[in-house]
C-alpha cells in the first residue's frame, strides 16, 4: 500500500500550533513509511480566505522545514472537477436537487427544536417529482443512506460508529454553484490518492459523511486518525491569552524550529522516557499507535527549556543563520565585532531565546550612551579607579589578543594590587559592557576587542573622575 498523507489548512488565519502539530504528525507518518506528503489549501470559504493567510501558512511550513512532495493544491482551482462529479452523482441518483426555500427550512428547524428533535433536513425534495424550471435556484444534496451505520477504525481512538439515521442529506453544492467543504475534501482525497487522513478531533463528525460520499462514488476509503486538541496549562482550549499561538510568532520570539518541532511532537506522542528528538529520530520512531487520545497541555516553560537546549547543542554556525534575522530586526550593525556564531557561544548559556541574544549583544558591536545607573553607582566608584587604570594598561600591552591573555591581564592586576578578582572584574565589566552582567569577562573583553575595550575603560575613568569632582 502506497502511503500518502496530506495537510489541508483553511487560509482564514495564521498557521497555529495545533495545525502545525497535525502537519508534523502527517509529515512524520509519511516519512516513516517512505510515503508522500501533500499540501492542500482548502480555500472554499471565499469570504474568509485571504492571500495573507496563505502566505502565513506557507511561511510557517517552510520555517519548520516540513517540505511537501505535492502541492500546494487549491480547492478554488478545482471547482470544475467538483461540479462534474456532482453532476454525475445527480444522474446516478446519489445526489439530488433541493428547491426548499430558506423560509421553509427555518420553519422546519423551529418546529423540530420545539419538539425536542435534532434539527435536520426532512428529505422532502429527495422523493419529490415536482417539475422545476432549469433556472430555478436550488442546492444539491447528497442522498445519505437512510439505514445502517458507518464504522471506521480510528488509528488513535479505536472503532467509532455513527448511525446513518443521525446524518441528514447534507448540501454539497450551494445555490451559487459553489461546492461545499465536506464534498471538496472527499473528491480531493480520492483524486490525490490519500491513504491516511490525520487531522484534528474537531473533524470526527465530518468523517461518517465523507465516508458515505466516498462509498457512493465507489472510491477507496482512507484510514483516519483524529488528534486530540491542545489546551493551555489551565486546562482550557489554547488561545492567545496563553501566549503565542502562531508558528511565526514563535519565530519572532526567538525560538528555533527544531525546538518547536521537538515540543510539538511530544504534545500527545511519546517514545519511552525520551524528551529530546532529532528530526531523524522523530521519523524513525513515530507511530500513530503511540499518540494519546487525551488532550495535551501546552507548557511554555518546557518549550523554553528545549529552545535553550538546542541553542547550546546545535552547531553555532547553524544557530547563527536564524539569529541573523533577529539581529536585523534589532537594527544592529555587526560589521565590527564577533561573528554571529561566536556570539551564540558567548550568550547561549545566558539566553533562552535568539531574541534575548539579539537584545543582549549590542555592546559587542556598538557604543553605549550611558552606563547602567545601578551598576555604575555600585562599581564605578573612586576606589575602582586604580584597578581600571592598571588593567587598562595591561590589556593595551597585550600583543596576542586572546581570551587567555585577557584573563592573565585581569588576574595579574588583582595580584599586583593584592585585591580579589571581583575588585577588578566588576568595575571592568561595567566599563566595557555598560552593565553589571555579561558572559565570562575574559571572553567578553576578547570579543569586544582591544581598541574598543581600552577606549571604554577610559570612558569609565572619566565617569569616575566626574563623580569625584561632584563629591
UniProtKB/Swiss-Prot annotation:
It comes from the Bacteria. The keyword Protein biosynthesis applies. Its main location: cytoplasm. A motif ('HIGH' region) lies at residues 9-19. Its cofactor is Zn(2+). SUPFAM superfamilies: An anticodon-binding domain of class I aminoacyl-tRNA synthetases, Nucleotidylyl transferase. GO terms for molecular function: ATP binding; glutamate-tRNA ligase activity; tRNA binding; zinc ion binding. Zn(2+) binds at residues 98, 100, 125, 127. It catalyses: tRNA(Glu) + L-glutamate + ATP = L-glutamyl-tRNA(Glu) + AMP + diphosphate. One of its GO terms (biological process) is glutamyl-tRNA aminoacylation. Keywords: Aminoacyl-tRNA synthetase, ATP-binding, Cytoplasm, Ligase, Metal-binding, Nucleotide-binding, Protein biosynthesis, Zinc. Belongs to the class-I aminoacyl-tRNA synthetase family. Glutamate--tRNA ligase type 1 subfamily. This is Glutamate--tRNA ligase. It comes from Enterobacter sp. (strain 638). The gene is gltX.
